[in-house]
Amino acid sequence: MGRAIGFDREKYIELQSEHINARRKEIGGKLYLEMGGKLFDDMHASRVLPGFTPDNKIAMLERIKDDVEILVCINAKDIERQKMRGDLGILYEDDVLRLVDVFRDRGFLVNNIVMTQLEDGNSQAEAFIERLERLGLTVARHRIIPGYPANIDLIVSEDGLGKNDYVETTRDLVVVTAPGPGSGKLATALSQVYHENLRGVPAGYAKFETFPIWNLPLDHPVNLAYEAATVDLNDANVIDHFHLSAHGESTVNYNRDVEAFPLLKSLLERLTGTVPYQSPTDMGVNMVGFCITDDEVCREASQQEIIRRYFKTLVEEARNGLDTTQSERAAVVMAKAGIKSTDRPVVLPARQKAEETQGPAAALQLHDGTIITGRTSPLLGCSAAALLNALKHLAGIDDELHLLSPESIEPIQTLKTKHLGSQNPRLHTDEVLIALSVSAAKDENARRALDALKELQGCDVHTTTILGSVDEGIFRNLGVLVTSDPVFARKSALYQKR
């Protein structure tokens, strides 16, 4: 039994590419299209809109790629703070390189990187710029503009956007993207419009922001899931009062777009003498809302995503010794959605197993609703146990049968503790999978269990203690959606190995 589908992927590709082409014709000249969210690997969208694939947006752009040039932004401050893409477990700066490779592999033109919010003394950002230039990429430096976005007189001047490097592009549709939010995509697009018009090149701006979905209600779980995903930015969905005033229609946008709209309107007025947009919603080209085929499926998926985001904030606060600001914001979003953390089906079974066994435990929900649990034993960690139990269930193997015998596990434990310096003899998920792969050469049951791995894609897991980076990474690679209680397995330890 697979995951329920609530979104029409093919309709989206067709409708969205047509709408972008229509906007290009309306604007005339060069169009800078800010791509909100992730252009590639949009895991969030695929979780809250079942049927939307992580590469949906890039597949849509492939329809018109001969007219497209990609411009990738990265915020210098994100390099300094070593910000990571949580869904992929890589640094933003590494993701810039990955994105360039992915775009080029799919036949897109991408030669330029924009370093935003660059300040003197940011040595890490400058080192990354040098690295990019050695790789043959052109890097534009964009500075912090005091008073952005409120000080319009300064922004639209030689001392504002005029101080930014101009990026020379060769195509009429320039897609501005980034590893994640807060990277400066809007400012980059506006800077380019400013510089193009100085050079006598007609240029305009439009925005493709998947979330919030403008034609869904403000409190729809899909839109609330976006708020939960951006608690670190303190973003909030709001009614677009500009659109309501201009068109008498209530639509949803997010606070930073609404706040920045007067800047965009003023910029376009000063540059071209005309204002094509009366509201932030007018700026957008998003057709996602028209491609939802089952609202209830998307509501349920989004509610589960909100809960996952809540647990994620709790774990990050525990790991990094942070205050509770972000988890409190996430809790507010849960309250708006009318849900609680235990509405995640795997939470209570994991906690009940932990209480029964007096040790860390895990619970995994299969696509048919079956809950599989795993306990901590002298041989296996709870995540590894739950993984093996799930594979046995999926492969139709008797629960009493050992896929890995104690005799096969003990040499691995000896290697870990006596030769590799580990204090924890229990096998992690990666070690279990390697052992299972070795066994599969001669054991039919092990072979069947390995074949069942693909059925874990999109399943949910909850653990009663914070996972280490190894188990977290294995689950991520398998496409399993993991949450944890904000408790360390060794509560008394000051240094918690990740």
Curated annotation (Swiss-Prot):
Supply the InterPro entries for this chain. DUF1846 (IPR014999), DUF1846_C (IPR048441), DUF1846_N (IPR048496)
Describe the family membership recorded for this protein in Swiss-Prot or TrEMBL: Belongs to the UPF0371 family.
- Enumerate the Gene3D superfamilies for this protein: dip2346 domain like, Domain of unknown function (DUF1846), C-terminal subdomain
Recorded protein name is UPF0371 protein cauri_2449
